[in-house]
Amino acid sequence: MFNQRKVNISFDDGFRDIYTNAFPIFKKYNIPFTIYLTTDFPDGEADLWWIQLEKHSFSEKDFEDKLKLIFDSGRPMAEEMHRLTKTAIDYDICINEALSWNEIKEMIESGLCTIGSHTVSHSGLTRISDEECRRELFLSKERIENELLVKVEHFSYPHSMMNANVQSVVMGSGYKTAVLGYGGKVRVGDDMFGLKRKYIIQD
């Protein structure tokens, strides 16, 4: 079993194109997959500032430069996006880009989709207090389990922000595994709360 190479396909956040683009292919070829869900997405509360930043950037470099300024600013990300683009969050865009709970339920009912947690609000856990970290972990898990009637045992660190303290909180929050967004292959004996992935984006 362990001599065979295996691939696990997973998505973070909860964008609707998982349902519209990827799910039909997974159904056709019977491919299992995991969604690490940020519960603000289907709840209609997510401020998808990076999508709106793309719409207000004139080039890939402009987008990347603005993105770096946002991450380096230390201010709330949506607030900094607003400052850079002079544009308020458009929640209609956010809702249209996000999965709905009904779409998630349909994917679960296919028998192919496993749901994990990716916090409530996609906060970088190393940048918030221990109390806020626990809230993000417990409330997202609870929300998913109550809405979808599934057990949530897997977690993905937003922005891959993880340290020993955050990892300890995750381990004490009822999860069995936690993944980063990068790092490469997973091998036998790897830390189950620091599992690596290969990050794939569209060209």
Language model regions located:
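C-terminal active-site subregion of NodB/CE4 polysaccharide deacetylases
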Residues: 1-10, 16-19, 48, 110, ...
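Residue-level detector of anion-binding/catalytic polar loops
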Residues: 32, 114, 176
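Active-site beta->alpha N-cap acidic-glycine motif
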Residues: 1-109
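Short beta-strand segments
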Residues: 37, 116-119, 154-159
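Feature marks short, surface-exposed loop/turn motifs that line or immediately flank catalytic pockets
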Residues: 41-43, 123, 158-161
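Histidine/lysine/aspartate-rich catalytic loop segments that bind and position anionic ligands
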Residues: 99-104, 108-132
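Residues that flank catalytic or metal-binding motifs in active/ligand-binding sites
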Residues: 31, 121, 191
